[in-house]
Regions:
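N-terminal Sec-pathway targeting helices
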Residues: 2-21, 28-30
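...with weaker cross-activation on analogous glycine-rich loops/strands in unrelated enzymes
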Residues: 62, 123-201
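Low-complexity, Gly/Ser/Thr/Pro-rich intrinsically disordered linker/tail segments
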Residues: 190-224
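N-terminal capping segments
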Residues: 30-147
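A generic structured-segment signal
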Residues: 22-23, 41
């Protein structure tokens, strides 16, 4: 191969590399902060009765369980972008959010102001929380605090994913460093999907993740 041919091959290789790099960057740009709101199909062929709460905290004619589920879906339908920020208002108001905001907005619009409730609980039971200085604007948006709060204010349920009938749309599921709302749709094995917000690279807000996680530490229902 002469000098001219080597130069031509080098140019071709560089061009191919540039095209490949542009393609990768394009895919990344299309994925970053572009989480889909499209709901996965309910694939379970069996019959699992839905649970309905006897409580309607906000008096809107919709029971708590249904309210929490509907509100979680309504929140992610606004397509919040993932970013951890501090807000003087507590609740994000700029189109950004994290995993705890899915739960906070789902409960808020069902009659449960998590910001006020968690702050009151921290001040009443400071020994239960590892917090040096309480801050109502952020404490309710931390998973570690919600673990403590729900452990004694909500209805505790099984963490065994195989007990599929015990997992109902509108339930809360807590992982070691993450939290979400259980969906009313299920995979082929009857395991429900989870409505959550975990990353700016997340492909969809509602995903089949329960069986894949090994760090489930809590499963709760807001009311009976």
């Amino acid at each position: 191969m002469n000098k001219s041919e080597r130069k031509r091959m080098l140019c071709v290789s560089l061009a191919a590399g540039a095209i490949l790099l542009c393609g990768v960057l394009l895919v990344l740009l299309m994925r970053y902060q572009h989480t889909s709101t499209v709901r996965p199909q309910d694939q379970y062929a069996g019959q699992i009765p839905d649970f309905y709460s006897t409580v309607d905290a906000d008096g809107d004619g919709v029971d708590d369980q249904t309210d929490v589920l509907d509100n979680a879906l309504a929140y992610v339908d606004t397509r919040p972008k993932y970013k951890s920020r501090y807000y003087q208002t507590g609740y994000p108001d700029d189109g950004y959010g994290v995993c705890t905001d899915v739960v906070a907005f789902a409960l808020k619009n069902a009659g449960y102001d998590l910001q006020a409730l968690v702050d009151a609980d921290i001040r009443e039971h400071p020994q239960w929380y590892d917090i040096r200085q309480p801050d109502a604007n952020i404490d309710f948006r931390r998973v570690r605090n919600l673990k403590v709060f729900f452990s004694h204010t909500a209805v505790a349920l099984t963490t065994e994913v195989s007990e599929t009938e015990e997992w109902q749309g509108g339930d809360l599921v807590i992982f070691e460093k993450h939290i979400g709302i259980v969906s009313d749709r299920r995979n082929r094995d009857g395991v429900p999907y989870v409505i959550h917000h975990n990353s700016p690279w997340q492909s969809a807000y509602e995903q089949d993740i329960l069986e894949k996680r090994t760090d489930i530490v809590g499963h709760y229902r807001i009311s009976e």
